[in-house]
Structure formats: C-alpha cells, structure tokens
C-alpha cells in the first residue's frame, strides 16, 4: 500500500490518499463530514464577524403622535419612529428590523428598508416605523421608559443578530387645542436632552478642490424653535481668526445653514417650540485645513486662514440673538487635522468626525436636564471615553 500526502482545500485538515478502495472510501466519508462541519462553522462565524454596525450618532427615536386611540378621536396616542445609518457590509438577503417593548406587554415590530452594501460604505433608509408602517390602530397612551433593539436577519445565511440595544423615555404635553373635546389631546415626545453637550468637529471637501483644500465644519444641538441665525466665531490664542472684510462688510461669513436632524413633535404644543431638538451643521468658509492646490492663499477679499500653519488649541463661540450660547474647544495638529481623541473611532461611528464636549451657556434652550448625557446618551449607550463639560 502506497500513501501520498496531498494538499487539501482546508489547510488544517491534511488529506492522506490510500490505494486501498475500502480504506479510501472510509477516509473520504470521514473527510466529507469534517469538511461539512468546517463549512457550516465558517458560515456561522462569517455572518457574526462580518455583520454591519449601527452608527450611534445616527440613531434617532421619536414618538409619532396619532390623532386617535382605538378609533376614538378625542384621545391621541403614539407609535415609535426610527432613523438610523448602518455601516456596511450588509450582505445580500439581509433585513434590518426593530422591536420596541413597553412595560405591561405592549410591543411593536417593523422592518426598515435594507439594501446590500459593501464594507467601507453605509446605508441610511429614510425612516422606519411611524404611522405609515404601523397604522393608526397600533397607538398607545403609555408614557415612561421604552426598550428597543435593532436587529438584522438573513434567511439566505440562516442568521439573526442584534446590532443595537437601547432605551428612551416618552413623555407628553397638551396640544395647543382648547375645548372639552380636546382634553385628552396630548402630544407625545421623546426626551432628547442628552444630545446638547455632544458636538462634532470635522473637515469637509472644498466645492472645487475637494480634499486639497478642505473646510473646517462642526455640528451641535439646540433645544428651541429657531427664530434667528446662530453665529459661530473661531478663536485661536485668544484672538478671533478667519475674518475677511470687503468694502466694510464681512466676506465668507461663517454660518449654520443646514439642519442635519430635526426632532419635532408631529402636532403643535402649548407652550410652542419647547420640545424641538435640532442638530445643525456649521462651516467656516475662510478657514481651510491646508492648501495643496499649488495656488496661493490670497483671495480678492483677503488671505485664507490655514489650520496647518496654526496648530494648537481652538475654541468656537456661538452667538444667538446677540448672546453667547455655546463654547466648543478642540485641537489641531501640525498637519492641519483635528486632534483625534479616538472617541468616535472607539465607538464605531463610521465617519471622520471628532466628538467634542459642548458647553451650553445662557437660557436660550430653556430648562433641560444637564445630566442626561451620563445615562441616556445614544439611548442608553453612552460614549466610551466621553466626558461632558463642567
């Protein structure tokens, strides 16, 4: 009998080939069984290891107020609504879905639109849940803590995994309607105060030169109905920087022109505007991280301010209606990059933003819970390594 050592498809399982027919049959049967076990094991591990992640800063849970409760239009009720962003890979056949539970047995379960997405990319459905997905008959009048999970099932691969587990508090306030028929018209909302001390500083590609001359930008939260612009100012070494003047007026003025997220009640409330949380994105057009275009920094209105030429500590001060309402501090390295504190990376946010503490000043936001970020941040998933402002 002659034996030969042959390479196998699974390196950890060397294959001995025998010229004896009986022995050969026995060995092939054993190896086939072992190979099947390995394949199934690898498939299960692959599904678990290659699963997507939920970007924490994208998850927004709101209460969608319904105009009836069990067919009674004199009573309002609510159902959950969810926004999220999923970092790939999302395998073919995957389905993202969410489950919400309340004490006493109330529950909702609904799918989120899902698309196959490669690693290094992300998928963001418009929204999940709400009235359109759940219907008027699924509303409840409960207020208090609610638990939820975001999961992914894949019937092609035979797996079901939990991607995110969270909790939040639902409260209610009376609508702006008056009269005996509206006594039980309560508008429901999710308390989002934990957002206020958490901000983001980042670079964005220039409209023309892209990453050869990126712009300094940031995002922050406010709790108020916006009745005027927020005015950001950047300071370095105690002096304001990035200002250009032309014929007595500022050119390239910094501003907060885009609302990234708006958490608004679905109905009007009294007092009005008290339960509106908004995340705004702001930018400094005259402030660039670096200039690798081969062109100079001089413009017809003045010279661009480069972070790469001015590393160190910076502070963003924000005015609202003439009053100082925010202070955001961050650092810049010698290359002009935002000093990375690794909070965003370690918490798998999946973007290039640096998370920074935001000091809330004044009373423009009304009364809010200054300690909510410690326990309620990202719906019971506080950021590892983050410390709020004093």
Where are these regions (language model features)?
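Sec/Tat signal peptide C-region and signal peptidase I cleavage site
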Residues: 44-48
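Bacterial N-terminal signal peptides
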Residues: 31-41
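Contiguous segments within soluble domain cores/interaction surfaces
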Residues: 49-162, 188-318, 326-328, 334, ...
